[in-house]
Amino acid sequence: IIIGHMLNFEGTHADVFEVFIQIGAILAIYTHYRRTFNGFLKRKNWIKTRGVSLLHISAGMLPVLMAGYLMQYIIKEYLFGPIPVIVGLIIGAIFMIYAEKRTVSGRLVDSVNNLTIYQCFQIGLYQMLCLWPGFSRSGATIAGGMLIGCTRRAAADFSFIMAVPVMIIVCVYDLEIGRAHV
């Protein structure tokens, strides 16, 4: 957003370009976690009590998708400028430092397979911070996971597994919106 503003590359075409950039990230994450994603294709893994399931992923995605949809006008109108993005970067960095210092001590969730559906939902609530452009989605979810009692590894694994469906949904939505404006 900041570079796009400096180069005067803004508007619908820039939005579509940003969507296509995300495809590389989606493919990289999918490649790394392909066993987990391929496991989701089995119906028995859609809803299960042990290990990460589609239900866990859905619980994590729900807050950000609903908030993003409901607040899309406000976000696009007021937060997609260089100054709000810089503020988001700074606040995001402070939040991640805070999470490092305030990580819950004691018994930590040490694997993505040990997350409860409620914990996934809580991480999803933290993910809403990334609706502020500049605030890192992975930073928000990893830091949020650490604040609710996950190890950095468990929070990162869940963050990246959850990223693929979220980014796919956002990309498809943005492409459809972009197509409507072309």
Tell me what each language-model feature is:
Residues 1-179:
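Multi-pass membrane proteins that catalyze or facilitate reactions on polyprenyl-/lipid-phosphate substrates
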